[in-house]
C-alpha cells in the first residue's frame, strides 16, 4: 500500500497554529464519536486518570478516525511496553505524564522510535497503525509522523524544564496545573498568583525553546489567559465535567436542590 502517514496535529504545531481541544474521560467510543463531531481540533483520550484499557483506547481511536478532530492519548506512565502497544493500535500523538527530568524524556523518546533512533519493538504485521503490514516504509514514516508531548507538573520538573526542552524528539510540553499547584504548595488552587506567574513563565520558556506549549483549563477565563501567554494547544473542557454540570443544571430547573455545579470546581 503506497500510503503516506500524516499527523495534522503535529503539522499544526509546527506551523504555529492555535489548536483547541477537549478532554475525554468517559472511556466510551460512543462519547468519543459525539465529541469528534463537535469540531474540536484535538481530543485527549485520558488513559491516566480515566479507567481506560488498551482496548478502550483502540475503540475510541476507531470512533474518532472518520472526523477532522485529532486524537491525543495520555498514558498512565511512560513505560516502553505500554507505549509500544498504544502506538501499534494507531496512536500518533502521545502525552506522557510526570516527566521530571531530561533523562526520563530521553527514555520516552527512545520508546516511541524504531531503531536506529530508538527501541520501539517491531510488529507491523499485527498493527492497526501499519494497516497490518500494508503501508510501505512504515517504520520510517512512523518515526517522522509521531508527535510526542510530555507533562511538566512538579517542582522538580520546573527545575529541570530547560534540560527537558533540549531533548531532541520532544515536540511539546504540557503544563499540568492541578499537580503543579499541589507540588508548589497550593493544592487545588491553580489560580493562586504565584502559580499563575509560574505557568506564564513556563509557557514563555517552552515557546522560546521552539516547542509547543499546552494546557488544560476548565475555566474559560484561564484558557484565554493561557492563549494570550502563548500556549498553542489548549484543552478547554472535560467531557465528564461538562456532563455533570449539564445534568445538575437541568435538575435544578425542576427541583429545589442546590446544584453542585454552582461550587468552584477544578480538574
Swiss-Prot record:
GO terms for molecular function: 2-keto-3-deoxy-L-rhamnonate aldolase activity; magnesium ion binding. Pfam families: HpcH_HpaI. Coiled coil: none annotated. Its cofactor is Mg(2+). One of its GO terms (cellular component) is cytoplasm. The keyword tRNA processing does not apply. It catalyses: 2-dehydro-3-deoxy-L-rhamnonate = (S)-lactaldehyde + pyruvate. The keyword Transcription does not apply. Mg(2+) binds at residues 153, 179. InterPro entries: Aldolase/citrate-lyase_domain, HpcH-HpaI_aldolase, KDR_aldolase, Pyrv/PenolPyrv_kinase-like_dom, Pyrv_kinase-like_dom_sf. Belongs to the HpcH/HpaI aldolase family. KDR aldolase subfamily. This is 2-keto-3-deoxy-L-rhamnonate aldolase. It comes from Salmonella gallinarum (strain 287/91 / NCTC 13346). The lineage of its organism: Bacteria, Pseudomonadati, Pseudomonadota, Gammaproteobacteria, Enterobacterales.
Amino acid at each position: 500500500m503506497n500510503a503516506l502517514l500524516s499527523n495534522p496535529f503535529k503539522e499544526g504545531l509546527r506551523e504555529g497554529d492555535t489548536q483547541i481541544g477537549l478532554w475525554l474521560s468517559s472511556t466510551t467510543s460512543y462519547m468519543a464519536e459525539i465529541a469528534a463531531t463537535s469540531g474540536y481540533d484535538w481530543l485527549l483520550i485520558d488513559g491516566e486518570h480515566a479507567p481506560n484499557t488498551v482496548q478502550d483506547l483502540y475503540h475510541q481511536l476507531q470512533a474518532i478516525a472518520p472526523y477532522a478532530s485529532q486524537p491525543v492519548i495520555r498514558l498512565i506512565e511512560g513505560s516502553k511496553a505500554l507505549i509500544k502497544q498504544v502506538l501499534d493500535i494507531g496512536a500518533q500523538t502521545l502525552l506522557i505524564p510526570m516527566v521530571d527530568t531530561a533523562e526520563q524524556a530521553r527514555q520516552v523518546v527512545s520508546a516511541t522510535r524504531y531503531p536506529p533512533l530508538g527501541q520501539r519493538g517491531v510488529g507491523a504485521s499485527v498493527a492497526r497503525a501499519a494497516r497490518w503490514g500494508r503501508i510501505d516504509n512504515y517504520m520510517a514514516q512512523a518515526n517522522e509522523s509521531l508527535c510526542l508531548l510530555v507533562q511538566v507538573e512538579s517542582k522538580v520538573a520546573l527545575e529541570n524544564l530547560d534540560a527537558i526542552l533540549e531533548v531532541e524528539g520532544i515536540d511539546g510540553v504540557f503544563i499540568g496545573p492541578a499537580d503543579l499547584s499541589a507540588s508548589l504548595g497550593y493544592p487545588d488552587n491553580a489560580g493562586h498568583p504565584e502559580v499563575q506567574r509560574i505557568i506564564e513563565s513556563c509557557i514563555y520558556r517552552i515557546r522560546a525553546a521552539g516547542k509547543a506549549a499546552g494546557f488544560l483549563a476548565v475555566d474559560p477565563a484561564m484558557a484565554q489567559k493561557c492563549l494570550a501567554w502563548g500556549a498553542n494547544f489548549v484543552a478547554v473542557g472535560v467531557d465528564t465535567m461538562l456532563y455533570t454540570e449539564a445534568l445538575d443544571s437541568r435538575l435544578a430547573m425542576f427541583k429545589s436542590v442546590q446544584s453542585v455545579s454552582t461550587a468552584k470546581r477544578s480538574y
